[in-house]
Structures are given as structure tokens and as C-alpha cells.
Amino acid sequence: CYICHSLKYDRIYSNKNSLCYVFLIWTLTLIAIMPNLQTGTLQYDPRIYSCTFTQSVSSAYTIALVVFHFVVPMIIVTFCYLRIWILVLQVRRRVKPDSKPKLKPQDFRNFVTMFVVFVLFALCWAPLNFIGLIVASDPATMAPRIPEWLFVASYY
């Protein structure tokens, strides 16, 4: 990231590399959708008026999906933010002013803004993923016990 590796940022995120990253993200997205087509977990859900992932079709697949598409990314992003925060604290506590480049106020504001976006993203997606884990634990028993309003609210 820019805050931790500001000298390498321009090289890592050049226009050419950024296009490669976008292509990679779209490719990984298409690959991630393929198992849904194999397991039959994409179905129309009249509660949300949309074709969506059906959590009760396969418990193992639902758990894997939640772990690899929500839990692991949250852990990675949290680790990265912890590294950034440690750097921010080190820069603020530094006694020698010229030993390393200082953190600019704009960089700190950008960090806080990105962190707030991350927290809001996690808060928005957590209910749906936790409901998925609950349903996956015992689909026949738990799926009917999830209130419909809670399920619908977790999508929005």
C-alpha cells in the first residue's frame, strides 16, 4: 500500500499493472462463480426478488464460501490495517525528525477513510455470512428458524 511502501507505489500501481490487476480480479471473479454453477446453488429467491446463492443446498460449500470469500479476506485486510496503524504510531512517536520520511496529514486522512470504508463493508456483509454459517450448520433445522425479515435485511 501507499502508506507502508510509498517509494514503490508508482511502480507497483502503474497504468499497465493496474489494468493487469483489473483483468486478474475479473478472472478470479469468474472462477469463483463456476462452483456455483456446478453445485446448483444459484437459484431464484422470491424473498429478495433475485437469483442468489442458496445457502441450504450444500453445507460444506456454504462454509467454504464464507471462509474463503469473507473470513480470509477480512483477516488479510485487518492484518494490513494493523501494519499501517503500527507505522502511523511509529511515525507519530519518532524523536528524530529527519530519520525517515514523515507521514503526511493527507495520508493519515486517507488511511482513516479507507478504514471506515472497510469497517462498513464488513458490517454490511457480516450478517449475510453469519446467517450462511448458521444455516450450513444444520440446513433442515436452521433454515426455517431464520426470520424472513432478518434474511431479507441481511441482503440490503
Swiss-Prot record:
**A single GO cellular-component term on record:** plasma membrane
Tree of life domain: Eukaryota
> Topology with regard to the membrane?
Multi-pass membrane protein
Q: Which residue ranges traverse the bilayer?
A: 19-39, 62-82, 115-135
What is any one GO biological process for this UniProt entry? camera-type eye development
Q: What is its main location?
A: membrane
Where in or outside the cell it occurs: the entry states: Cell membrane
Expression by tissue:
At least in the brain, more precisely in the pars tuberalis and the suprachiasmatic nucleus.
Which keywords annotate this record? Cell membrane, G-protein coupled receptor, Membrane, Receptor, Transducer, Transmembrane, Transmembrane helix
User: Which GO molecular function entries does the Swiss-Prot or TrEMBL record give?
Assistant: hormone binding; melatonin receptor activity
Tell me the InterPro entries matching this sequence: GPCR_Rhodpsn, GPCR_Rhodpsn_7TM, Mel_1A/1B_rcpt, Melatonin_rcpt
What the entry lists under Gene3D superfamilies is as follows: Rhodopsin 7-helix transmembrane proteins
What function does the entry list? High affinity receptor for melatonin. Likely to mediate the reproductive and circadian actions of melatonin. The activity of this receptor is mediated by pertussis toxin sensitive G proteins that inhibit adenylate cyclase activity. Possibly involved in sleep induction, by melatonin activation of the potassium channel KCNMA1/BK and the dissociation of G-beta and G-gamma subunits, thereby decreasing synaptic transmission.
Entry's family note: Belongs to the G-protein coupled receptor 1 family.
* Name listed for the protein in its UniProt record: Melatonin receptor type 1A
Species the sequence originates in:
Rattus norvegicus (Rat)
- Write the lineage as a comma-separated list: Eukaryota, Metazoa, Chordata, Craniata, Vertebrata
